[in-house]
A protein has these predicted regions:
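Conserved acidic carboxylate
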Residues: 9
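Two-component/phosphorelay signaling modules centered on CheY-like receiver
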Residues: 12-30
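Acidic, metal-coordinating helix/loop segments flanking the phosphotransfer/catalytic sites
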Residues: 31-49
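Acidic catalytic/metal-coordinating carboxylates
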Residues: 34, 60-63
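Active-site residues of response regulator receiver
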Residues: 53
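Short amphipathic alpha-helix used as the core "switch/output" element in two-component signaling
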Residues: 62-74
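Hydrophobic/aromatic residues positioned on beta-strands within the core alpha/beta folds
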Residues: 80-81
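C-terminal output helix
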Residues: 103-112
Length: 112
């Protein structure tokens, strides 16, 4: 079974770039551009890897992490931001990676 990736980011070009990257590596990939759409898709997809932006048009993605973390305890979380804000409480560990924009494909290759 293919691993699933959900990317929640309002930058359409970044989502396209990352989607193409993961499709070439044979992942099942989903993208959403708002927090509410991303949360709905999360329930449907149950991703193995979640990329979520800090600042989305309808809220702060990282604020939802404690809720998401309880729903998907086995998922790997990849937090995206143009700057490095503080981490949400109780969300640290080996399944958490912070990506500062711009994200390079070379950097992704080191993880996937």
């Amino acid at each position: 079974m293919r691993k699933k990736v959900l990317i929640i980011d309002d930058e359409v070009d970044l989502c396209k770039l990352m989607k193409n990257y993961f499709l070439r590596k044979n992942y099942e990939v989903y993208t959403e551009h708002t927090l509410s759409a991303g949360m709905n898709r999360l329930e449907e997809v149950l991703p193995d890897f979640l990329f979520i932006d800090y600042n989305l048009p309808d809220g702060l993605g990282w604020d939802k992490l404690p809720e998401i973390y309880t729903k998907l305890p086995n998922a790997h979380f990849h937090l995206i931001s143009a700057f490095r804000p503080r981490l949400p409480v109780n969300i640290e560990g080996p399944k958490l990676t912070i990506w500062e924009k711009p994200i390079s494909l070379k950097a992704l290759d080191q993880f996937f």
